[in-house]
């Protein structure tokens, strides 16, 4: 003899179906700080603030110069800003994509984080979000130095439809 039971009135939403928007809106301060740290990680993955990418960007701005010690030196392309450089150039493409990754991820945090009602805690949230604003601005600063005029994308929706 088999007995079965069921719970007809169960309306609990499965946690695996939480959207990115809901997740960001539910973040506590520690989670928001960790997400902002992820923006720094996006920069590190491209070696921007710490290694070769910063050198490339500074060559464009004439802050440093390169030594043409070998043929096909990537820095020569940055120094000369030659017209034959296209999006097919892997180095330029990587630079473009990684900075826009930082911009898009910063936009998600800035636009979807929900400030708590407690004024002290809200101030701490704003400080963390200030870092996201800064990193988005820094990314645009470097991109403008390299590529000139760019569209200003401030929302995730704009990034989905207008990614340059």
Task: Describe each PLM feature range.
Residues 56-63, 128:
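Acidic helix-start/capping segments at beta-turn-to-alpha-helix junctions
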Residues 12, 144-155:
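Short, well-structured active-site flanking segments
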Residues 33, 41, 73-147, 161-163:
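Conserved, well-structured interaction surfaces
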Residues 44-50, 66-67, 139-149:
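Secretory-pathway/luminal and periplasmic proteins that interact with or process carbohydrate-rich
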Residues 23-24, 59, 81, 85, ...:
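Short clusters of hydrophobic/aromatic residues that line enzyme substrate/ligand-binding pockets
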């Amino acid at each position: 003899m088999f007995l079965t039971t069921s719970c007809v009135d169960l309306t609990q939403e499965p946690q695996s179906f939480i959207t990115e928007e809901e997740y960001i809106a539910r973040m506590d301060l520690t989670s928001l700080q960790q997400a902002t740290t992820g923006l720094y990680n996006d920069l590190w993955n491209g070696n921007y603030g710490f290694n070769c990418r910063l050198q490339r960007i500074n060559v464009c701005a004439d802050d440093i110069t390169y030594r043409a010690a070998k043929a096909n030196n990537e820095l020569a392309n940055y120094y000369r800003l030659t017209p034959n450089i296209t999006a097919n150039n892997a180095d330029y493409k990587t630079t473009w994509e990684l900075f826009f990754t930082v911009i898009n991820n910063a936009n998600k945090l800035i636009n979807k984080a929900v400030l708590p009602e407690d004024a002290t805690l809200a101030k701490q949230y704003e400080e963390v979000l200030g870092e996201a604003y800064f990193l988005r601005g820094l990314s645009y600063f470097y991109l403008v130095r390299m590529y000139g005029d760019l569209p200003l994308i401030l929302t995730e929706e704009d990034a989905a439809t207008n990614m340059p």
